Amino acid sequence: MGVVLDSRDMVNFLAQEDIKYVKNYDNYVDGEFVQYSGQLWDYKEITAAINTLLYGKWIVAGEKVAQFQIKFSKRFNVNHSHMVNSGSSANLVLITAMKKKFNWQPDDEVIVSPVGFPTTIAPIVQNGLKPIFIDIELDTLNFDVNLIEGKITSKTKAIFVSPVLGNPPDMDRLVDICNKHNLVLLGDNCDSLGTNWKGNLITDLYYAWTTSFYPAHHISTGEGGMVCSNDEDFINQARSISWWGRDCYCVGSNNLLECGTCGNRFDKWLDDFDGIIDHKYLFTNIGYNLKPLDLQGAIGIEQLAKFDMLESKRREYKNIIQKFIEDNIKGVRVIDASPNSDPSWFGVPIYCETQEIKEKFVAHLEKNKIQTRNYFSGNILLHPGYKHLDDAKKYTNSNLALSNVFFVGCSPLYNQKVLSYIEKVCKKWND
């Protein structure tokens, strides 16, 4: 008689039989498309998602998300983590919660780089604050820390740093500047999860920080993001803002309790109403609905177990691909790790001596099916949605980030077949 499997066992059995990795290059043939990144999932992520749908108690954020938040906090040495539906949402929640907690006023200032992904800057503008731009330096492509103090005014409240593809600026200087001028150091860590500074996680230096779980990032839940801080009150503000602005913080089965997590679910919560209301419908902030699905939390738990392997491969492949490029392509420079840092690389950043070299090298790679990316926006002030914020011409190095810089992947999905093909394409440059 054969073995009889229940439905949960059947899901696990079928997934193990059918899925090694959802995406992989095991059968790669030279000339096939090479993506710059993508999620590395196997049957564990798939079965976690399916089992959460079939047997979980919640569709929206519930017990799996709560478990993921706890495990994530432990892995990245932070007291509190709150999951949202994207890294961009995480940035929006972070800035909105900072404004609320510290009572920032309209036109208060946040220092940022003009080069990077737009949703580092957009939440500042959306909250009625003013981004103060610092031109980049060309060694690391981060904003030039030496220029920051010249831009600080009585309205400056924070520095919001986004390490370039995982590679940070001089963090000691940033901490000193923040301490000297009573500023808050914040991190957009979406591209740099796991980056170290002097042997410790770079995120240890931030008051609050974010990360992204988009498929291209270090771990992926499909879409998703996290807001992190050691300040519980700040995280409570972040949670409220991403949960419609409500005051209630019940999760999972606690939603069903008559007394709720707080013990006073039905009480006199409103100053101007003499009656009992449900705490679940008390709104202390103007908020959004930025909640993830519980299956994303389940996937995140499995991805977190793979993080050390994923990060190690990114570091290894960045160094290998850097050597391929520098050995074969003249007029380009791959960005090295900043002194005192050990980046968790998101990609391989390439600075070209001229715009012509960049355009020809990008065309060469794309023609040979190796995916490239601009360094995101380049100077964001050149773009229609942002050009009103400042004069792009003032930021000459940032303009070079658009004309002379791009990146390729160092994806943990790669294998020796893919790496060998990338080397061949680099060697063909001189044919």
Across the structure, where does each feature detected by a protein language model lie?
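N-terminal "arm"/small-domain region of PLP-dependent enzymes with the aminotransferase-like
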Residues: 1-59, 183, 284, 409
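PLP-dependent aminotransferase class I/II
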Residues: 8, 13, 39, 66-70, ...
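Phosphate-binding glycine-rich loop
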Residues: 58, 63-109, 122-127, 133, ...
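PLP-dependent aminotransferase-like
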Residues: 100-180, 184-189, 196
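Structural detector of well-ordered beta-strand residues that form the stable sheet scaffold
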Residues: 111, 132, 185-186, 210, ...
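Conserved active-site segment immediately N-terminal to the catalytic lysine
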Residues: 187-221, 236, 280-282
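Short beta-strand-to-turn element immediately C-terminal to the catalytic PLP-Schiff-base lysine
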Residues: 211-212, 225-230, 301
